[in-house]
Amino acid sequence: MSQVRKNDHNLMKVLLGPVISEKATMVAEKNEQVVFQVARDANKSDVKQAVELLFKVQVDSVQIVNQKGKPKRYGRFEGRRDHTKKAYVNLKPGQEISFEAEAN
């Protein structure tokens, strides 16, 4: 029983947050997908289990994109932003995740 709780605790660290952008909104409307920023060591099955656990929905498929950090300059110092990983989660028909705040 403690093994299940430990696994659930690890799944809570997989999803870092939703991606709110023009492209993510367009994909959500057109393809009924939701875009999440995920941990760099997460894989497709981890993301699927985490979404099903947190949002109580059924996931159809997951596509993952590794995004390299952009090179940036800070004055005379050169650096780059951190690499990120995004997951495009396709939900089964009839399933929906809403990120809008509800007023009581």
UniProtKB/Swiss-Prot annotation:
Q: In the UniProt record, which is one GO cellular component term?
A: ribonucleoprotein complex
Does the keyword section mention rRNA-binding? Answer: yes
**Cited InterPro entries:** Nucleotide-bd_a/b_plait_sf, Ribosomal_uL23-like, Ribosomal_uL23/eL15/eS24_sf
Query: What are the recorded Gene Ontology BP terms?
Result: translation
Q: Where on the tree of life does the source sit, at the highest rank?
A: Bacteria
An example molecular function term from Gene Ontology annotations: structural constituent of ribosome
Tell me the HAMAP family matching this sequence: Ribosomal_uL23_B (MF_01369_B)
Which family does the record claim for this protein? Belongs to the universal ribosomal protein uL23 family.
Q: What does this protein do?
A: One of the early assembly proteins it binds 23S rRNA. One of the proteins that surrounds the polypeptide exit tunnel on the outside of the ribosome. Forms the main docking site for trigger factor binding to the ribosome.
Entry-linked NCBIfam families: PRK05738.1-3, PRK05738.2-4
Name listed for the protein in its UniProt record:
Large ribosomal subunit protein uL23
State the species of origin.
Polynucleobacter necessarius subsp. necessarius (strain STIR1)
